[in-house]
Amino acid sequence: MQHSHFDAIVIGSGPGGEGAAMGLVKQGKRVAVIERYDQVGGGCTHWGTIPSKALRHAVSRIIEFNQNPLYSDQSRLINSSFSQILRQASTVISQQTKMRQGFYERNHCTMYSGEAAFIDDHRISVRYPDGTCDILSADNFIIATGSRPYCPPDVDFSHSRIYNSDTILDLEHEPRHVIIYGAGVIGCEYASIFRGLRVKVDLINTRDHLLSFLDQEMSDALSYHFWNNGIVIRHNEEYDTIEGVDDGVIVHLKSGKKVKADCLLYANGRTGNTDTLGLENVGIKTDSRGQVAVNAHYQTSCEHIYAVGDVIGYPSLASAAYDQGRIAALALTTGTSETHLIEDIPTGIYTIPEISSVGKTEQQLTAMKIPYEVGRSQFKHLARAQIAGMNVGSLKILFHRETKQILGIHCFGERAAEIIHIGQAIMEQKGEGNTIEYFVNTTFNYPTMAEAYRVAALNGLNRLF
């Protein structure tokens, strides 16, 4: 049994853990990173963001090819299965893992591949797969253990046709019909992927409309696009029982309806990976979903233990987790941090087409009684979109009628998650630098998707009187 002491120990090597570890070593700290699996990267790299987005990219390219008259008129349609595309996506995972492993090696982080659990305030055990154990100690700790799909106890996830958003990546059979329970971000993204592969999709939503945190217009656009592509959305429904049968799954809904399909993807919530950490030994409590409460500097109730990423809940974004880790590292080393997450964090939803937003929605601005105006552009009117055959989509800019300050930007369409950053950069400018007039006073490359900003700005400014 090995006993080692470090300035700081980071538990987890996903985006939050990586940001924390890199921030600490840059401050000259001796750092250990404990990862429960044999490869770094966390759920983001191996089961979440990277594989699902690689899948989505492949499916969207197949759709693009099949809808292009140059190819479809010649009966050259591509028909690829979920498992075939997933095998191709695995190459991206290996590239990401190798790159991130290099970060830790070059920065001289000491790596441990095992299960971490607190013994007391300054000691932690690392249990390895072979049953052996090391005891490590540190002055400070950063918990970045991430989250996993919430699996209710009354659903039999051992059944061969019932999956969660992690195990769906092990899908080997080719379903013709899938039920997705939960119409949040993950559910909607997988609905797009399966429908893009011509699989029938029943999307069961426990709420009254899709992705209620979005601007209503974006939510409605996604709902219409799903409907137009044959996805059946069942709003305001909850399961009574989920029954696995020999040839598939039957979902018995509380409304009395029944839905049957070849398989089911349960995608209704996530829970923090805290149950095996021994947090009771250091006096840290979690909520019903295993999440840890922190202050503005990401300190837990135990002042030398910090937590970042999905394990603390909102916003549960890989991009935010990395920044949280970096900020926590700075607070840990200096005692405080002047750096905070930006107020308006962009969200990217990788449905087909994408959705991305930053800032306020129309609903929020109306409730706040802020006098705003709207500028819109339709992708179908942009030369670049016409050239690329990506006519579905729109950009909406919300701005203050009097000051012209940009208050929110909402985009639906191909490359939305990239396009949003142009507007975000202007929104983050101080004082008079944040103005919608920037887009009419600046010359953009032509033809580009960035032209959407100029069109939307002119549209909005023309509404003023």
Swiss-Prot record:
This enzyme's EC code(s): 1.6.1.1
Which key words tag this protein in UniProt?
Cytoplasm, FAD, Flavoprotein, NAD, NADP, Oxidoreductase
Q: In which compartments does the protein localize? A: Cytoplasm
**Pfam hit, one:** Pyr_redox_dim
Principal localisation: cytoplasm
The answer to keyword Transmembrane applying to this record is: no
GO BP, sorted A to Z: 2-oxoglutarate metabolic process; NADP metabolic process
Domain of life per record: Bacteria
Q: Which InterPro entries match?
A: Class-I_Pyr_Nuc-Dis_Oxidored (IPR050151), FAD/NAD-bd_sf (IPR036188), FAD/NAD-binding_dom (IPR023753), FAD/NAD-linked_Rdtase_dimer_sf (IPR016156), Pyr_nuc-diS_OxRdtase (IPR001100), Pyr_nucl-diS_OxRdtase_dimer (IPR004099), STH_gammaproteobact (IPR022962)
GO cellular component terms, A-Z: cytosol
Q: List the disulfide bonds.
A: none
Record text on cofactor binding:
Binds 1 FAD per subunit.
The cross-references to Gene3D superfamilies, in alphabetical order and at most eight, read: 3.30.390.30, FAD/NAD(P)-binding domain
Q: Which reaction does it catalyse?
A: NAD(+) + NADPH = NADH + NADP(+)
MF annotations from Gene Ontology? dihydrolipoyl dehydrogenase (NADH) activity; flavin adenine dinucleotide binding; NAD(P)+ transhydrogenase (Si-specific) activity
Q: Which cofactor does it need?
A: FAD
Q: Which family does it belong to?
A: Belongs to the class-I pyridine nucleotide-disulfide oxidoreductase family.
Q: What does this protein do?
A: Conversion of NADPH, generated by peripheral catabolic pathways, to NADH, which can enter the respiratory chain for energy generation.
Name the UniProt record assigns to this protein: Soluble pyridine nucleotide transhydrogenase
